[in-house]
Amino acid sequence: MCAAAVALLVVGCTAQPTTGGTSPGAAASRTSAFNATDTAWILLMIPMAERARQLTDLAPSRSADPAVATLASKAGSTLREDLRRLRAALKLSGVPDTRPHEGHNMPGMVGLDTLDKAAAAKGRPFDRILTDALRAHFTQSRMLCAGEQNQGRADEATGLAAAIAKSTSRQISGLDTLRAARPATPGNHKTTVKPDGPHRTATTR
């Protein structure tokens, strides 16, 4: 499953390296360690991380839960570092960033519609959007990293995939713990809101 997912990316995302002012021999030496899986993986992980980072950036002004805001802040910092390392690896490969997934909603990627909904939400609705979207992002990211480790060749790429996978597993664990501690309906109480003239009265049973 993991290898197949990355293999599909290879078909549509492989790009030819550009040499610029570098001699053909030097360029070939620099890029020979990177195979199609390496570059396809990097070209997908960059926009995935960018979208997730955009979502976490909304948390300080929209989250109602300090724990969710803290989780988003930590995730955002990690994503920024991941992006720095991914862009460095892409530069090392010699493959240009052609943005093959620009505007796409790939599996696990935070969708443009999700970003719009998150930007319009506040409080608990925002927290739910953020935690659901981050869970999907982390899960897909970990799967793609496993595929890269199995099928990639360049040490720079496979090593980065291993590091991101390890970090993502920790974030999934932290997110799941947070979600489990905050069920939609706490305890066994159920609150019903009933209209009462111009006012509303909440009853708990």
Report the location of each language-model feature.
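All-alpha RGS (Regulator of G-protein Signaling) helical domain and cognate RGS-like helical scaffolds
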Residues: 14-205
